[in-house]
Every structure is written in C-alpha cells, then in structure tokens.
C-alpha cells in the first residue's frame, strides 16, 4: 500500500481522513527512529518536528499503543493513530526548516541536531542543555549526528582496534601535540600528513 511495508501515521490525522487541521501535531518531521532496547524509553519513537510553532522546532517522543502481547501496534479502523499524548517533548530556541534529528542516549539524555544552524546539543530528561556544539563555518548544515562512547574505537575490550589509545589520532602510540596538529589539518581541509 501507500508508504511502503511499514506505515504508522501519527501526528496529522487529516492526511488520512481521520481528523481536522486542528488535530495536526507534526509538520515537516524528520529522523523518526525507535529508541534502542535498554535505553530509557526503549521501543518508543523519537523524532524532530521541524515546524512546531512560529520559527520553533521540537523533539517528540511517543509511545504507540501496543496489543496485550506487546508485538503489534493498536490501530483503530476509524480513529486517529495513537497515542493522544506525548511521552516527552523538548522545545526551545532552535529551529530548522529541513532535515535535523534526535537520538536517545543510553544515559537518558537526548542528542539533537539542528541542520540549518549546524548545531548539535544534548539535553537531559528535564530539558536542561548539558552539552552544545555550534559549527563555526558558513553555509554548512548538520543533518543528523550520533554520539559514540569513548571506547567506541576499541581498547583492551575490543577486537576492532585492540591497541588503539583514545586520542591518538595519528596512530603513533602517543597522545601529543602531533595529534592536535593532525586534527587541525583535517578541520581546515589539508590532507593528513605523515608525521
């Protein structure tokens, strides 16, 4: 049918003849994803709602209603897709007309990317910003970003890069000024040099 193999139409019931314009909750949403198992809110959907209000965006978390064995979404034949209420929402002084995204982190915080502003920030469950990054360049967008744990590239617990030292960007088995030079060169578009 219309929309592919999986279709969950929450947020604008007038688009499928089950509501009016006044019941619209989403406008130009992006980056819908399931919250990973083991993370706070696991199994819920989280998304970036580009046009939440006048020049305002928002991140929504919803918990779609499930049947008794928690394997299928409950979809009434005549009513709008549930839920009626948000599980969690964050909005504030950010807006993007395009792209953008949000991902729940294992500690319960949410990483938000605002494409038009080339900004990435992390908020806790109460909506307080705990980390913020604004790309300093012009004419740049950050569509979506993800945060990796400090041990992502390996260390003693990994077979991928067992001898990798966190921060050793040039792989010379040492954290030193050469790693910094390497990062600066990459940032400004110079080709990496052999040091």
Where are these regions (language model features)?
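Boundary/junction segments of secreted and surface-exposed precursor proteins
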Residues: 158-174
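Histidine-/acidic-rich catalytic cores in large beta-rich domains
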Residues: 1-160
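Alpha-helical segments with a strong preference for the paired helices of cellulosomal dockerin domains
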Residues: 169-195
């Amino acid at each position: 049918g219309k929309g592919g193999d999986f279709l969950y139409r929450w947020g604008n019931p007038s688009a499928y003849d089950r509501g009016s314009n006044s019941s619209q909750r989403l406008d130009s949403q992006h980056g819908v994803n399931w919250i990973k198992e083991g993370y706070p809110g696991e199994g819920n959907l989280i998304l970036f709602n580009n046009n939440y209000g006048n020049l305002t965006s928002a991140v929504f978390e919803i918990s779609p209603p499930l049947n008794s064995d928690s394997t299928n979404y409950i979809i009434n034949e005549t009513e709008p897709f549930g839920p009626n209420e948000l599980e969690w929402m964050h909005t504030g002084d950010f807006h993007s007309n395009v792209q953008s995204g949000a991902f729940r982190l294992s500690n319960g915080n949410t990483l938000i990317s605002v494409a038009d502003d080339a900004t990435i920030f992390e908020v806790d469950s109460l909506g307080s910003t705990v980390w913020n990054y604004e790309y300093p360049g012009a004419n740049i967008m950050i569509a979506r970003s993800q945060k990796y744990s400090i041990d992502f590239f390996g260390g003693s617990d990994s077979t991928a890069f067992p001898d990798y030292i966190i921060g050793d960007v040039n792989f010379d088995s040492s954290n030193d000024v050469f790693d910094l030079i390497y990062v600066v060169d990459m940032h400004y578009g110079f080709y990496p040099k052999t040091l």
